[in-house]
Amino acid sequence: MRDTITIAMCGKGGVGKTTTAALMVKTLAERGDKKILAIDADPAIGLSYALGINVDKTVDDVRNNLIQKVKEKKIGDRDDTLRMLDYELFDVLVEQGKFSLLAIGRPEGEGCYCEVNTLLKDIIESLSSNFDVIIIDGEAGIEQINRRVMKIVDHLVLVSDTSSKGLNVAKVIKEVAHDNQVVDYKSTGLLLNRIR
């Protein structure tokens, strides 16, 4: 069994979470001694582009396909559903040299990303034993923290610029994660970007 290290980038939009995650993935991949999973948990799919990967299928595509098959009664019980989900998720996983990428995608409907975030949480738990390091590029704000998507994270990296809004979002994320015990993390840190 692997002792997987999970690192999550969180913060306000536009502060450099995606760039930081991409640099971390590339640096670890260049070392070549770890099996890495990059998770593009931001619906804007920025990490995929930053890593130079064209994503054909996302977690949300799998979710929509699964919903359709359940409606059409093309799959049976819960075990059948889980087996199909497991198979489809490995189809979504893009292997790129020394790392793999999983993109959450952009839900088609209006409203919140609750269903796809819940699925993402289960996927992270399911896939973690197959990798040495998981790097998550989270969506902007506190949604994925509140929804416990990042329930088990070793290192919570709060990325911010020097603006009061960016620093406040980082502070709120840390408070929510700590005070509400929604993230079980070993360490947290603040990475300041765009310092002049």
Identify the residue ranges that each predicted region occupies.
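Short coil/turn connectors at secondary-structure junctions
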Residues: 2-5, 32-34, 97, 130-132, ...
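Walker A/P-loop phosphate-binding motif and the immediately C-terminal alpha-helix
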Residues: 5-43
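Alpha-helical scaffold elements adjacent to nucleotide-binding pockets in ATP/GTP-utilizing enzyme cores
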Residues: 24, 46, 50, 169-173
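N-terminal phosphate/diphosphate-binding loop that engages ATP/GTP or pyrophosphate donors
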Residues: 30-96
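Cytosolic-facing regulatory segments adjacent to core modules
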Residues: 81-96, 100-138
